Amino acid sequence: MAAKIRRNDEVIVLAGKDKGKKGKVTKVLATGKVIVEGINLVKKHQKPVPALGIQGGIVEQEAAIDVSNVAIFNAATGKADRIGFRFEDGQKVRFFKSNGETVSN
C-alpha cells in the first residue's frame, strides 16, 4: 500500500496529549508510526558514553505516534484533510480529497 503520510509532510495531531498541534514529519516507521517534530515529547534517561563524547542526563526527545492519530494539513483550507491517489501523466500522485489539489512533495 502506498504511504499517505510521508517525510516532510505538514501534519496535525487528531488524538492524544498533543491534539490540535501541527508539525513536520521527520521519520516514517515501518510499524505504522511516525515521528513528528516537536510532538509527543518524552524524557529519556541517557547514560553517559565517554568514548563517544555523549553526556549523561535527562534528554527530551520526540517519540513515535501512530499514523492513525495524525492527518495531513491542507494549507489551502486550513484544516486536516484526507489523501487520495490518482495518475497524472503516468505518475501516481497524492491529492487532497476536499479540494482535489495535488500534494506537493
UniProtKB/Swiss-Prot annotation:
SUPFAM superfamilies: Translation proteins SH3-like domain. It comes from the Bacteria. InterPro entries: KOW (IPR005824), Rib_uL2_dom2 (IPR014722), Ribosomal_uL24 (IPR003256), Ribosomal_uL24_CS (IPR005825), Ribosomal_uL24_KOW (IPR041988), Translation_prot_SH3-like_sf (IPR008991). One of its GO terms (biological process) is translation. One of its GO terms (cellular component) is ribonucleoprotein complex. Keywords: Ribonucleoprotein, Ribosomal protein, RNA-binding, rRNA-binding. Disulfide bonds: none annotated. PROSITE patterns: RIBOSOMAL_L24 (PS01108). Belongs to the universal ribosomal protein uL24 family. NCBIfam families: rplX_bact. Part of the 50S ribosomal subunit. PANTHER family: MITOCHONDRIAL RIBOSOMAL PROTEIN L24. One of two assembly initiator proteins, it binds directly to the 5'-end of the 23S rRNA, where it nucleates assembly of the 50S subunit. One of the proteins that surrounds the polypeptide exit tunnel on the outside of the subunit. This is Large ribosomal subunit protein uL24. It comes from Vibrio vulnificus (strain YJ016). The gene is rplX.
